[in-house]
Amino acid sequence: MVLIVTGVFALCERRRIDSYGLPINEAFGGLFWNGVVAGLAVVAFVAAGMLVTGGMRIHGIALRGTDLISSPLLWLVGMLLVGVTEEYFFRGYALQSLWRGAGFWPAALITTALFAVLHLLKPHENAIDIGMIFALGLIICISVRITGSLWWAVG
């Protein structure tokens, strides 16, 4: 849906659909894989902290047989689609259109605040979670400013 709406806006603005931060010629290139490594490092750091403080326990592997391969692969595909959708919506068209009209920092703060507020719709989110989501959103906006691409954030 996000790609369709962005495509309509791109037609109206006479721009290519990939001009909003996801250039096709950079798909799954270096920025994407650097983002994958950065994301995995953050997840590992957070998980280690949770294990050390007792906030998480591992009781074993619940998957067996073909599910041991298919479930993680489906999860990876799902997370990739979430990444593309969220980034293209918040840091693609919205950030870049506001950036052209209002400047980078107002655009970054507005889109990041919206991103964080919408996460309040998820059950069990708290102020710390929303603060971390806001900080992550700003980091991603800055990465778009530096690289001109959303591929690092998608990774």
For each of these PLM feature ranges, what is it?
Residues 58-61, 119-127:
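Membrane-interface helix caps and helix-loop-helix hairpins in membrane proteins
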